[in-house]
Amino acid sequence: MIVQREIERATALLSQGKALDSVAVCGAILAREPKNAIAAHLMGLALKDTGDWAQGEEWLNFSIELEPARGEFHANLGNLLRKREKYTRAAEAYEKALQLLPDHKAARRGLALTLCDLGRYDDAEAQCRILLSGNPADAEALAILGMVLANRGQEGEAEAAYRRAIALDPTSQVAHHNLGALLARLERAEAMAALETARRLGADGYEAAYNLGRASLNANDLGAAETNFARAVELQPGNLEAQSTLAKVRFMRGDPKFARALASACSANRDHVRLQLLLAELLWRAGELTGAETLLHDLLRRKGPNPGVQSTLAAILLDAGRPEEAETHALEAAAARPDGHDVVLNLVTILLARGAAEDARPFIEAQLRRSPDSQAWIAYEATVARVLGLDRYRELCDYEQLVRVFDLEAPPGWSSMAEFNAALAATLSDRHRFSNQPLDQTLRNGTQTSRSLLTDPDPTIRAILKAFERPIEEYRRTLATASDHPLSRANVGASKFTGAWSVRLQREGYHVNHFHPDGMLSSAYYVEVPAETQDPQRKSGWLKFGEPRYAAPTLTPERFVQPRPGRLVLFPSYMWHGTNAIHGDEARVCIAFDMRPVRG
């Protein structure tokens, strides 16, 4: 009787949040009865709540050894294993719990979540359907189903599941938060309301802060975005995504100490290689080559060889004009990680910059066998073919045939392109709120919109996206369907936009030569251009094709296109392209988009 009262006391303390007191009571019970399974299990739960997950797991396992037929013991072990990201073992624990207690709803929900963690979305959905077959009004099961569907790319069905869960249980912070996170990912304006509701209901952790940051960014509320991302970093200073996003937002807002939170986390975690590497990469992108190089040399000295560190150091050294040193580090990195896309890409870039096209060629061919539609490797295939004088270059880079220029007519509702572009320019001006260019892209001395234009409801933006459809179809009709040409073989069936954004070049603004890795067909549409672009000799602000990023003297541009308001240029995403700088105070404003074929 005394032991039973003490177990009840330990349980009450645990439910009151007094985990340490519960541990003490359980310890006293176990000193008298070392094989008391319930006390051992409570000890495991209490230790878990103190944050000692390892000891908690040991005690939960011990309690199961003592009484293996208790389904709730297995379910609680599954909860802790999932917290510890031991997903396979967590799934096994939940499955055992359900063998013993088939109607244990919490265990089935835990199993569905864990299967989702494992990427086993069909199995996760099946568990949700079992729950819903027993109770179609199970709001928790609907919220989990929404998560499963969202992870599987079924955004519409996921949204419907979340909204049904909220209708059944308006107090579900999980459903409100996950709906908001989905809408933020889709860059929809309703995300903010859902996330604010979740916060009022008590969602105040890392994911809530980060997703509020995303939603604020989409709403062009840059101050709120920074505040929320800073909160996310405060909650998880070692989170790479949050640190990277916060630093990039601060950089684009013109903050000279944009990486201060990351630098602080690196100082506190000097052995966290990925954090240190992220800081070096961001410093490099911001032009602070010396600081980035020093950090990586120190990291290699302290932690030893690391292909990711060496590859990034090689890229920095190339930018610093030291290609021989760069090649040494790049070769070592590629030898250690021969299948690493970015590692091999850095090596190939350095080899081509040094004029070693024959040395680069085997790496490119191997990567193309693995990823034949990779825009990066097609770009480098074309570069090597050009250097070596191979016919393949002209097949891939027929600039007259594959770079097409369309001068558009005014969309319905506007009397002229001048009137339309003036309205469009005013709309875009309101969306260009940053002070600096993105930290990790090819724009220099300019700004880029933060929200995709694809989800922007403004009528002028909807009108210009609609106006692009006819020239896109005309472009596609002119393409052959040769199986050995990457653009032609993709020209089958439907295609879709994968991104659309606006760029504003300011004084001395330009684009570094680049390709678009996430597209198949890319573009530039000119909204406003400065008067200096009319000079055909200087070619200020003109679009240029054929010059790689690290060009040899002979690899000069092979085609230029003059920007004009109302002009759309379409071209393969793998083509190297950039712009000449503009030099005056008038801005050059354009819209760009990428497209890919719809698969399956």
Regions from the PLM with identified roles:
Residues 34, 68, 102, 136, ...:
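Short coil turns that delineate tetratricopeptide repeat
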Residues 395-490, 510:
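Non-heme Fe(II)/2-oxoglutarate
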Residues 455-469, 473-570, 575-600:
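Catalytic core of non-heme Fe(II) oxygenases with the double-stranded beta-helix
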Residues 15, 49, 83, 117, ...:
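Register position in tetratricopeptide repeats
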Residues 3, 37-38, 71-72, 105-106, ...:
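Helix-start (N-cap) detector for alpha-helical repeat units in TPR-like alpha-solenoids
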